[in-house]
A protein has these predicted regions:
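Catalytic core of membrane glycerolipid acyltransferases/transacylases, capturing the structured
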Residues: 20-31, 64-118
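Hydrophobic beta-strand scaffold residues
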Residues: 54-55, 89, 112, 138, ...
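Polar-ligand-bearing catalytic/cofactor-coordination segments
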Residues: 112-115, 216-221, 234-237
Length: 254
């Protein structure tokens, strides 16, 4: 039964990726960016139902354009990278030409970064800042790679520094999966694709995947290092299973 479920979900997900890749550029051309974003949000909802992702949100999405900074426990996080307004998503260049996934990511205007290249990381900074100043949001993972889902990995300070210098607001997003199987880590060296496919198949066999998203209140940073520490503490706090759920603004008030 679980194998049949996985086959159906994989087929439906590939079809949805193809629909997004083919339809979104045309919708954006004819109807404009806002209509394209509404289509994208509908697509996200369809993907959640297809994968049976049960998403719990704690706190609110920001009312103003913001840089959303999230921890990165799984590749499933790509289905959680959205805001109520058009959003620029930063992703690893390695996935740009992946069948279905890469095609769809190119259609939504993903900003690609070579994670091991400092110059590439520097080049994406103005793209993110310009997006926010153009009344869009941006979503990225300052860890730069997926982790084991237990604690955040090493966080790079670059985007915190850029946000502080530009005076644009940032919102922290804590991502916690109820099923430990969702977390995924690989060094992207030998054997990555077979390892990824085996892990994906095991997730597709799961009856349901629960995920909890916790949003902080938007804040303008004055000290990049302090903002980075706040992000790390916010994520660690959310990942603790023994902490009762409470409003996101209870963590940081300034």
């Amino acid at each position: 039964m679980s194998s049949l479920r996985a086959i159906w979900r994989l087929s439906a997900a590939c079809w949805l990726f193809a629909v997004l890749a083919l339809s979104l550029p045309l919708i954006r051309l004819v109807g404009g960016p806002r209509r394209a974003h509404r289509f994208f949000l509908g697509w996200i909802g369809a993907m959640h139902r297809t994968l049976n992702l049960k998403v719990e949100r704690i706190g609110e999405l920001p009312d103003e354009p913001s840089i959303l900074l999230g921890n990165h426990p799984s590749y499933l996080d790509i289905f959680l990278c959205y805001d109520r307004r058009p959003t620029a998503i930063v992703a690893a260049r390695e996935f740009k030409w992946f069948p279905f996934v890469g095609w769809a990511a190119q259609a939504i205007g993903t900003v690609w970064v070579h994670r091991k290249c400092p110059e590439s990381r520097k080049r994406i900074v103005p793209c993110v800042i310009d997006a926010v100043k153009a009344q869009r949001s941006a979503f990225l993972f300052p860890e730069g790679r997926t982790t084991d889902g237990v604690l955040p990995s090493t966080v790079r300070v670059g985007m915190f520094k850029a946000a502080a210098e530009a005076g644009v607001p940032v919102t922290y997003v804590g991502i916690r999966y109820g099923n430990g199987k969702a977390a995924y880590f690989h060094d992207l060296k030998g054997g990555f694709v077979p390892h990824l496919l085996r892990h994906l198949w095991s997730l597709l066999c799961e009856p349901q995947i629960e995920v909890s998203l916790r949003y902080s209140r938007p804040q303008r940073l004055t000290c990049p290092e302090r903002g980075m520490r706040r992000f790390e503490n916010f994520v660690r706090w959310h990942l603790r299973r023994d902490v009762p759920l409470q409003p996101a603004h209870a963590v940081y008030r300034g």
